[in-house]
Structures are given as C-alpha cells and as structure tokens.
Amino acid sequence: MTVPLRVGLVAGEASGDTLGADLIHALRRLAPQTEFFGVAGPKMQAAGCEVWEPSESLAVMGLFEVLRDLPRLVRLLGRIRDRFLAVRPDVFVGIDAPDTNLRLARRLHAAGIPTVQYVSPQVWAWRRGRARSMRESVDLVLCLLPFEKSFYDEHGIRAEFVGHPLADAIPLEVDRPSARRALGIDSNAQVVALLPGSRRGEVSRLAQDFAATARWLAAQRPDLVFVAPMASPAAREIFAHALELHAPGLDVRLIDGQAQA
C-alpha cells in the first residue's frame, strides 16, 4: 500500500491562500491521495487542506501592529513550529510571507524536514545578504519571475521558475464590456475602484480614509460608480462598517474577490 505524501503549508495572507489552493489542486492531480495541513485560508481549506490556524492569524502589517501583536505572534509561531516538528511532514512549503516562513523553515530544515519557499523574497532587489541565510533554511525556491532563478543559481540555491498565477488569470486583452456586465455596471458609467488591501489590519487602518475619499468624490461627481473588491468576509465586514460610519447612504458595490475584473 502506497503511503500518501504529507505536505505542511503556511500561507500568511489572501494572496498566499490563492497560491496555496492552486498548488493543492496541481499536486492532487499528480498524487490524488496527498494530505495537506497547516496555516491556510478559505480557498486552501476548500481545496482540501486541514486548517490548524487561519491565514489571517499571521496577516499583520505595519510597525505598530507588529509590536502590538508580537507576543501573540511569537506564541502562535511556536505552536505551529512544534506541531510541524511533531507531525514531521514529508515536505514543508512556506507560501510567500518570507519573514515568517523562512524563520520557520530554518527550524524545520535543521530538524531534517525538507523545506520549500514558494514565492521568492525580493533578495535580488534589497538585503541580498538574506541569500546566505536562505541556503541554510530552504532546499528549493519556487520563483514567480524568470530572472529570479538565475539569481539563486548564482548563489548556489536550488530554484525553479514556475510562472506567475496572474499570467493565467488575467487576459492579455481586457474585455471591458464583459467585465462590466459581470459586475452589473452600465457600459458608459464612470467607475472608481476602491482597493483597500487584503490584510485585516491593513483594511482596518485604511477603510475610513477610503470611505471619506469616496464620499468626497461622490459629492463632486454624483455620476460616479464605486466598486470595492473584498479579499475576505472579514475585510468585507470591516469595510462595510466604515462606509456606514463615514459615507452613510453612499452606494458602494462590495464584491467578493474579482479584483482582476
């Protein structure tokens, strides 16, 4: 009887959740019995990943937010690390979020667990010294951009170019009429997209400013149509509350995902 491959995953935000779900689907096509577990978002969970902790628990941004949440994050990462060490997956894949995942990968790698970083940190642009520490943390880097592989080859780190998922998701030629029909927007409307981000803390900090700006624009141009893609139910709730407080009565169409449209 073949023992199924066991893959540990950590995705720290909405974009990582999308990448993780695509990875799960791709691996399942090759090895249908593969088991997935770790820190995941709703898309990864729907794809079949056992969720130890939700991705949003790691999604913090900004110095104040990090300092405020530091004790909680340290405890959380300690629990995740210890659980991976106890379960010992066949491979650990950290998806984006390099500050979190490379630190975790170093501990797991030292314990003999193969480690992969999916999405290269921008070591080719700044803090190039991180490449040395990556040699001690990861066995493989999966790169979204073709030139990144060459950089890692030069630094003695195994890497593979796997392509950027948006290359498949976004057409080369945008069909604006179809996109507007899908969103229920008149073909001649002047549309303003409100994009407050995907992280809970990010949306919390920016939602009031977005709402106030939309209210001001609507006062100047009553014909404008506002559309706001929401990365998660939590982001939708936060943004809707900000609109109620700071732009009451303003018609803003909150849509789930579909930022590419």
Where are these regions (language model features)?
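Loop-centered beta-sheet repeat module
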Residues: 231-241
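Nucleotide-activated donor-binding/catalytic signature segment of Leloir-type glycosyltransferases, i.e.
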Residues: 239-257
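Phosphate-coordination loops involved in phosphoryl transfer and adenosine-cofactor binding
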Residues: 4, 188-189
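Short acidic-capped amphipathic helix/loop micro-motif used as an active-site/signal-coupling element
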Residues: 207-212
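Long, contiguous binding/interaction regions
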Residues: 192
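Active-site and donor-binding regions of nucleotide-sugar-utilizing enzymes
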Residues: 5-180, 195-203, 219-220, 225, ...
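Conserved hydrophobic residues forming the short capping helix/wall of the S-adenosyl-L-methionine
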Residues: 27, 214-218, 242-247
